[in-house]
Design a protein with these regions (language model features):
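Conserved acidic donor-binding segment of nucleotide-sugar-dependent glycosyltransferases
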Residues: 341-342, 346-353, 362-367
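N-terminal subdomain of nucleotide-sugar transferases
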Residues: 1-44, 163-165, 408-409
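Aromatic "clamp/platform" in nucleotide-sugar-dependent glycosyltransferases that forms part
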Residues: 309
Length: 409
């Protein structure tokens, strides 16, 4: 089997898949990523590409992302031509096409089976955009998003099959394309994610927090409204007043992964710290953490708060569940798919800081009900194992079409 894996930030979601495939006898696994892609330790099949130029600053605002996608597609196609000229012709191309890399893949490798990871299809209503009245969208936002969907529509038209991690993400795509889209999560390391009664972590200020301590955890790639950071901070202010011994470990960077940058502060962390009054001795911002330290955070957690707009589900929620954390999640569509209220965690209204604080305080107190939820969360997370993800993607590589609406076997 000859496979070409494409991701702007390779390996992205495909790391564990590439690692497994590259070890198989007779498999030739190559990859494409931007020159800024981190690569995969122990894997030397990555070919980097570089954009010919940046998008023009004078480009129409609605078209800037499309011009960027065209430049990515051009650069990736040139890299694919080099692979072809050196004798590599893939049987399958697996790609995250969200930046435009596969726009011209079929022009280079017309006989390859093109499989797209279709992570998201934007809509101006009914999901992330316009969800939070605190940040209303403009007509220009709506028009820009509609134009940007031209890329995602082309991607769905061009591919032979598509896959998405959750039923919620699949449901966001136009109905005409749903028969093409299967559901399969890539998988998390459930073998390496487990509770640890002896886990401990030392904060930057020197405080040592251990499993069993009243520790609230919050994790996001970046601290921003899409992941409910503003609401969490308001809830934390209430929590610290109610529970005088609780500590909060807040993991995430100060950049923006989704949505817009804050206008009246350097970043969302500074903006929210100016709004709420927190005890700095009990509030621990870690920034982004190495994997081992991140795991310790989940293992010392007495209550893990996960909030998100109706958007892509974070791996961190599933990883917290695999560690047996007590989950307090927003009652939004992607979270409902992973967490059952009263069984594997508690669902709370996204915007209700008072209710979030109340339920989190209950989780800190523990008890038999929360112990049962933690155990059930860990058991449920096994459904998202790396083994299940690999089996599903193996089937997708050779299937004539994905199974619709169910995890790919």
């Amino acid at each position: 089997m000859r496979i070409l894996v494409i991701h702007q930030n390779f390996p992205g979601q495909f790391g564990q898949l590439v690692t497994a495939w590259a070890k198989r006898p007779g498999w030739d696994v190559r990859a494409l990523g931007r020159e800024t892609a981190p690569g995969l330790p122990g894997y030397d099949g990555l070919l980097n590409y570089k954009l010919a130029r940046a998008p023009h600053a004078q480009q129409h605002g609605y078209l800037r992302q499309m011009e960027s996608a065209t430049l990515h597609g051009q650069a990736a196609a040139r890299a694919m031509l080099k692979l072809r000229d050196h004798g590599f012709k893939p049987d399958v191309i697996l790609a995250h096409p969200g930046w435009g890399e596969t726009l011209y893949a079929k022009d280079v490798f017309p006989d390859a089976r093109l499989v797209h990871l279709c992570e998201w299809y934007y809509n101006a209503d009914g999901q992330d955009l316009g969800f939070d009245a605190e940040f209303p969208i403009s007509f220009d936002d709506r028009a820009r998003i509609r134009t940007w969907n031209a890329l995602h529509t082309l991607n769905l038209t061009n591919c032979d099959a598509a896959v998405t991690p959750t039923q919620w993400q699949r449901s966001r795509h136009p109905g005409i394309f749903l028969p093409k889209i299967g559901v399969q999560h890539e998988g998390i390391d459930t073998d390496g994610l487990a509770p640890d009664a002896n886990a401990a972590i030392r904060t930057r200020s020197g405080v040592v927090l251990k499993a069993g301590d009243p520790v609230i955890t919050y994790v996001a790639r970046n601290l921003e409204p899409y992941r409910g950071f503003h609401v969490f901070m308001r809830a934390l202010e209430r929590l610290q007043k109610q529970h005088k011994k609780c500590h909060a470990i807040i993991v995430g960077g100060d950049g923006v992964s989704y949505g817009k940058r804050v206008r009246d502060a350097t970043n969302w962390r500074e903006k929210m710290l100016a709004e709420v009054k927190l005890d700095p001795e009990r509030t621990h911002f870690t920034g982004k953490l190495p994997r081992a330290q991140y795991l310790k955070v989940l293992q010392v957690s007495a209550a893990h708060v996960y909030l998100t707009y109706p958007f892509v589900l974070s791996w961190s929620l599933l990883e917290a569940m695999a560690c047996g954390a007590a989950i307090i999640g927003s009652d939004t569509e992607p979270v409902r798919e992973a967490v059952t209220d009263g069984e594997t965690g508690a669902l709370v209204p996204f915007f209700d800081a008072a209710r979030i604080a109340e339920v989190t305080a209950g989780a800190l107190e523990g008890g038999s009900a929360w112990a049962a939820r933690r155990l059930a969360a860990r058991q449920h997370a096994q459904r998202y194992s790396m083994q299940a993800g690999l089996a599903g993607y193996d089937a997708l590589l050779s299937a004539s079409s994905p199974k619709v609406g169910t995890p790919i076997p």
